[in-house]
Amino acid sequence: MKPLSYEARMREKADALRKRGHARILAVESSCDETAIAIVDDGRIERANAIASQIDVHALYGGVVPEIASRMHVEAIDPLLELALSQANCSLEDIDAIAVTYGPGLVGALLTGVSWAKSMAYARELPLIPVNHIEGHVSANYVAHPDLEPPFVCLVASGGHSHIVSVDHYGQYRLIGQTTDDAAGEAFDKVARVLSIPYPGGPLLDKLADEGDDRAYKFPRPHTEGRYDFSFSGLKTAVINQAHNLRQQGLEIDAKDFAASFRRSVVDLLVDKTLLAARDTGAKKLTVAGGVAANSLLRSELMRRGEKAGLQVFMPPKRLCTDNAVMIGAAGFYRLMAGELAELRLNALPSLRMFEN
């Protein structure tokens, strides 16, 4: 009798895990400039969260250098595994499956994590679970709020993505709205550069804005054809042009007020559209995810206005908004429970679309 292939053996293991309804997931995230390994139980319980950040290195270049990012992922990933196992007080024998981000992101960075995860899964005879990075961000809410269950509406806002999504069930999504051009995080980074704020611009702009008057400068509100869509390109351009015009006139720009006024414009647009989508879909619960979800004004406005609209509002702690592997472990568990596994030919997909699997 011909022996079963790796894929066939893993399907049998995954079936047993699904019947049991429990799984300890080793998760890997390497889509950009953070290498991360986490251990998550049942999609809800964080056992370990090991992260190696590259921010200080890329800050020297004013942004992420893909080749450097890939090399640093290779150097960091094995030590992070040891750290994660130590944090969880467990061994590889206790791991039931491996989840890995396979897109979207930087191709070289993704390949590091995918190749490592495939090798580990094959060597340890463990099921391999492919996870969309953006779905991971949404799933961070499951770890932060063990009582949160679908359906709910989620605003996903990061450096490369801005979406409003209806989460109808675990792993089942409907795209309600999205940016028609730039992502919110990209707009924050570009305006930060104009204000001579060093990398990473978005978080530093947020801190600067806390000290400013958000009514000091007037910026246009972008219009979109889609009822729930965003547009940040025009706003970003208007803000940058206004800064250049003021400087050409010899006028001083108050960086704190400028940052605060810009932040207010972006946050108002994000919150307005998200609450409109929640109202029109009849949602009772609202969540937020992604790096921009760490923005202090966005968090406070979503909570204040969401609760005023009668919604239950959930958001991850800031440490789970930026890239991490805990969120990948959470998403991976529900993919496993749905019977979704990767074959060993799994490849990195840097342009993977929203929740495309």
What are these regions (language model features)?
Residues 20-94, 100-104, 133, 137, ...:
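N-terminal beta-alpha supersecondary unit
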Residues 35-41, 154-156, 162-166:
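Short beta-strand scaffold segments in enzyme catalytic cores
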Residues 49, 207-286, 295-309, 336, ...:
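A contiguous, well-structured pocket-lining segment that forms one wall/lid of small-molecule binding clefts
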Residues 103, 107-109, 117, 123-146:
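Active-site neighborhood for divalent-cation/phosphate handling
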Residues 130-131, 303-328:
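Conserved phosphate-binding/catalytic loops in two-lobed NTP-binding clefts
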Residues 146, 169-211, 236-237, 241-245:
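Glycine-rich phosphate-binding loop plus the immediately following alpha-helix
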